[in-house]
């Protein structure tokens, strides 16, 4: 399976379990520098009052299946959208995501 197909399958799977989530691809895959052993880095921003472990597992579960099927490691970070958008300061990580991230 090609990496672009993996990213498309990730997008479709996540939109099924979290239809209003914003999914941002970042890292080597977003920069077009991914190697065969590179992981796929994601930030998943959700519009929930709070983020529970149960809801996180509901979102992540389909990604485990895709990892097994594709052999590519998927590294998701789930955050509340309001916290991401209203953080009090920028970090090197957040600037990196904003500069190179691709919304899926």
Sequence positions of predicted segments:
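Catalytic core of pol beta-like nucleotidyltransferases
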Residues: 1-22, 30-32, 36, 47-104
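Short beta-strand->loop micro-motif that forms the acidic, two-metal-ion catalytic signature
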Residues: 40-45
């Amino acid at each position: 399976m090609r990496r672009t197909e993996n990213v498309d399958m990730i997008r479709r799977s996540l939109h099924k379990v979290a239809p209003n989530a914003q999914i941002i691809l970042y890292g080597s895959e977003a920069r077009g520098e991914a190697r065969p052993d590179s992981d796929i880095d994601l930030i998943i921003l959700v519009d929930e009052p709070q983020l529970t472990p149960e809801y996180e597992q509901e979102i992540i579960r389909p990604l485990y299946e895709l990892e097994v099927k594709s052999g590519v490691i998927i590294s998701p970070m789930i955050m509340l959208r309001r916290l991401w958008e209203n953080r009090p300061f920028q970090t090197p990580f957040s600037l990196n995501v904003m500069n190179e991230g691709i919304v899926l």
